[in-house]
């Protein structure tokens, strides 16, 4: 994940994607398919199924053009595109960077003029797949291709790229959160960072020690727990570590459980003890903590991988594993982007050929090696490429090992609306001192209505 994901979040996709689903429901009532593909009604087929759709344009010998729209810039993919086109002179990739990406995709979907290739950030695969805008990938065929090495993808990718048990996008890039600390400050206080990360009790004790040396260190607080642009990002790790699950076995929301309450109570205890300031929204939620960390105002902080290059080298800092529950349960947030093929693509085999190259070891190596913005390597075998721009002294490889415990809530087609409800209810707890349990109960009632759709 990088700043590009943030850019899409800032577009506020909630109402936009909700319109896609609402239109789908309205059309279904009229016995019309999910999206209004007025210009070209193409059935959703399984990519890699062997359907010879390329013959429609391929017989003439004309070059196939695949239109690709993305929230990213062209230079991010330029080397991969050029390498693919050199190996495949019969296929041309027409790349277009779109600023208001979600709005444009909606407009094109309702007009039946979707691009062939669609970037899918966290939660978007499920929304577009449910709306009928994406084609399925034949995963059995991908796994059978030994050169592609499908099983090299991190296991976590399945949650982000599938809908209703089928793969509608393939993993491309992303980013997770981790923690960094000021080595000099910790050394002055005699604090040793456990290899596996602080337990909650150890984290509290470290905060206490840092506060006892506050004046000597020149800090305002040991750390800050920022209410990020998404409330889910802030609390997901703590809730998961406490033993909470977003979904129960019956598909209802479980974020009003005793474990969820315990997570809120623990974070609130850090505030009550004066170890962190009151939970608030600082700036856009991404750069604010790094700015304070660089200035020596806090001794440790949570950092998104895609913003970690803003950590200054004149500060003696290192990465550390995320805090973990006293029983060892550990969690962090992972965002993962995929790329899919639109349901209106007339050349899905050519599109799949490009996507397979882009997400192959060769393609991802070209993509990651010179990328100035850190991205996770979606393939386990390429993990070191994601943090190759950092000096080894910063221990940034911990962001790779952190993928073993990083994840996110279960993603469904109503994710955007769920995100809004969660944010509103968490705000009531943090900013209006609302009762934790009753607020979570009310939140779950609303979420269950969405989950039942």
Predicted regions, residues:
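Short, well-ordered beta-strand elements
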Residues: 61-72, 91-96, 117, 168
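Extracytoplasmic "Venus flytrap"/periplasmic binding protein-like
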Residues: 83-153, 187-190, 291-292, 299-300, ...
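Extracytoplasmic/periplasmic solute-binding protein
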Residues: 164-172, 177, 202-254, 268, ...
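Long, aromatic- and glycine/proline-rich binding clefts that accommodate carbohydrate-like moieties
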Residues: 320, 369-424, 428
């Amino acid at each position: 994940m990088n700043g590009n994901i943030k850019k899409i979040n800032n577009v506020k996709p909630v109402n936009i994607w909700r319109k896609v689903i609402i239109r789908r429901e309205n059309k279904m009532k009229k016995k019309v398919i999910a999206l209004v593909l007025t210009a070209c009604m193409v059935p959703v087929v399984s990519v890699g199924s062997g359907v010879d759709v390329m013959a429609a344009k391929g017989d003439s010998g004309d070059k196939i053009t695949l239109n690709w729209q993305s929230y990213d810039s062209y230079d991010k993919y330029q080397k991969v595109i050029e390498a693919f086109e050199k190996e495949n002179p019969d296929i041309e990739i027409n790349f277009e960077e779109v600023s208001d990406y979600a709005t444009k995709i909606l407009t094109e979907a309702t007009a039946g003029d979707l691009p062939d290739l669609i970037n899918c950030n966290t939660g978007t695969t499920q929304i577009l797949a449910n709306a009928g805008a994406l084609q399925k990938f034949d995963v059995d065929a991908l796994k059978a291709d030994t050169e592609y090495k499908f099983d090299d993808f991190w296991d976590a990718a399945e949650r982000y790229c599938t809908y209703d048990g089928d793969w509608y996008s393939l993993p491309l890039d992303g980013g997770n959160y981790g923690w960094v600390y000021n080595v000099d400050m910790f050394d002055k206080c005699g604090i040793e960072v456990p290899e596996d990360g602080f337990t909650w009790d150890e984290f509290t004790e470290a905060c206490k020690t840092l506060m006892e040396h506050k004046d000597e260190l020149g800090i305002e607080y040991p750390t800050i727990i920022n209410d990020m642009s998404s409330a889910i990002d802030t609390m997901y790790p703590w809730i998961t570590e406490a033993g909470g699950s977003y979904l129960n076995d019956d598909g209802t929301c479980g974020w009003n459980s005793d474990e969820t309450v315990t997570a809120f109570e623990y974070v609130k205890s850090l505030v009550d003890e004066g170890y962190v300031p009151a939970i608030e929204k600082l700036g856009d939620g991404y750069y604010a903590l790094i700015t304070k960390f660089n200035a020596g105002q806090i001794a440790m902080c949570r950092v998104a991988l895609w913003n970690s290059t803003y950590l200054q080298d004149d500060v003696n800092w290192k990465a550390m594993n995320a805090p973990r529950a006293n029983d060892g349960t550990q969690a962090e947030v992972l965002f993962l982007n995929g790329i899919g093929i639109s349901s209106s693509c007339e050349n899905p085999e050519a599109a799949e050929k490009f996507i397979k190259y882009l997400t192959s070891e060769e393609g991802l190596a070209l993509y990651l090696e010179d990328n100035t913005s850190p991205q996770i390597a979606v393939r386990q075998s390429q993990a070191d490429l994601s943090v190759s721009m950092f000096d080894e002294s910063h221990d940034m490889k911990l962001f790779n090992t952190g993928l073993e415990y990083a994840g996110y809530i279960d993603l469904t087609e109503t994710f955007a609306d769920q995100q809004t409800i969660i944010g509103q209810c968490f705000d009531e707890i943090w900013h209006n001192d609302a009762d934790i349990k009753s607020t979570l109960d009310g939140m779950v009632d609303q979420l269950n209505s969405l989950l039942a759709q």
